[in-house]
């Protein structure tokens, strides 16, 4: 696998496709460029999903996220593009991408985009776990 930015998302087979389970990822180093000014934008991405048959492979996700660093993107557009690409790659039962952009012009922007597979219903009383934000060091 390459160590260069790439739009290719790789997957692997869900090890337990008969069970709904929640995958939570925090991606603290997302960058892209403001399409108006060319200035860098920074965000923390939170990816939550319930896989069906496929899970996203982490290194390919890292390289995919890295591929946006030199692209001009509006916050709303890039959040939805990333979600759409992940949905195409993994076809999850449920996926939510939350993008928390750092302040620009005195305004913090948060964008939340969701996908539900047609016909999928969560089990009764299932709530996705809340995770505290993690630093790069786990204790």
Curated annotation (Swiss-Prot):
Substrate binds at residues 56-58, 75-76. Disulfide bonds: none annotated. Pathway: tRNA modification; tRNA-queuosine biosynthesis. One of its GO terms (biological process) is queuosine biosynthetic process. Signal peptide: none annotated. One of its GO terms (cellular component) is cytoplasm. Pfam families: QueF (PF14489). Its main location: cytoplasm. One of its GO terms (molecular function) is preQ1 synthase activity. Catalyzes the NADPH-dependent reduction of 7-cyano-7-deazaguanine (preQ0) to 7-aminomethyl-7-deazaguanine (preQ1). HAMAP family: QueF_type1 (MF_00818). This is NADPH-dependent 7-cyano-7-deazaguanine reductase.
